[in-house]
């Protein structure tokens, strides 16, 4: 993708592949003034670690919108930590969308690389011509 995000960062995980537990049960936390649950996400198999590239993750979930708004991920190789932080959320057509996300790959306290993902002009439920989805167009682009 040419960024600090990988495929597993932008897709929904198969929840059956992970064990979950609260980071500090009973302790309330906030991200940008909103209540979050802080949850450990531990892969159940080496295959999942290989597929995602992460040994474990600490995710911050807003219960009011059921959305991960921050994550710390332990990268499988190299001793890196990846920090994912949703800086801006918008409700578009009734769907919560992370329109500004910062990703930083760190080794110790040093930032090795960072990516800022910004989404603009997001629209849902648009009518599209089926010809946009031919194999040729999907492979070559418009």
Question: What does each of the following model-derived ranges do?
Answer:
Residues 141-142:
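Short, solvent-exposed mixed-charge patches
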Residues 15-17:
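Short, well-ordered coil/turn elements that cap or connect secondary structure elements
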